[in-house]
Amino acid sequence: CVFSVGGGDVVRNISPNIVVALDEAKARNLTIIGIVGRDGGYTKKVGDVVIVVPVVDENLITPHSEAFQAVIWHALASHPVLMIEKNKWEGVES
């Protein structure tokens, strides 16, 4: 799963590590899921399922994208099927 603001860009050499990882995933026939900001960049181009966070304010693309991504990864980490251990604060007595 790719969490990125721009999603990588081959031409402008932005986040080349993401580009290489995506190419490797494609070469191995893996499913690519991404949550990205802006237009999604390379992740949007080659990904199988990609959510592009809408731009609300050009000056806040990074924090809006990362905030949305944080909600998703916390939901994944807290999902009962995926959770290995309970969340700390949910297990603390009042």
Regions found by a protein language model. Give the residues of each.
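Glycine-rich phosphate-binding loops that contact phosphosugars or nucleotide phosphates
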Residues: 1-89
